[in-house]
Amino acid sequence: MKKPIFILCLFLIIIGCSETKQAKPALDETSKETVMAESNESTFVYNESEAIWGFVIDTITGNEELTQLKPVEKEVLTGEMMEKIINKTWPRVQIKYLGTSNDTAFISIPDSEILTQQMGSAGADGFMVSTVYSFTEINGIKHVSFDFEAGDHASPGVYNRNSWDTNNY
């Protein structure tokens, strides 16, 4: 009776101590999402695939150049459509299109802290420039009036395509 119990215990010990060949995932799903979020942080701030205007690095000079990334049909473009495009392009800085008066589009940024405090000056400038250039693609729009709480990196006001020296990017 002792011999079968001894063999059974020995068998269980051997099985319990042997390595399994089943591959363990390197990261659990939560860790994967965190790593992806950290490695793709710029994707969450700026989504180039949705952008009409953006900055491209000139391979010869190494400078960033403001470039129209995709053509638009100005005849059918509306402020509401542009609001959706901007909000998809900049998911962490959500705008509200308020309306148009004469040649000015009016937008607000209810939660402007990311824009004014967290994106840095270059990120905030990139947002402001690309948003102005995108809105001024709409027929008749020459200016964009921004309403938001001022911060370290961006200020509200009325801007147009001449508000920045885009040759310095």
Locations of the language-model features?
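Bimodal "functional hotspot" detector
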Residues: 17-169
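Sec-dependent bacterial lipoprotein signal peptides
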Residues: 1-15
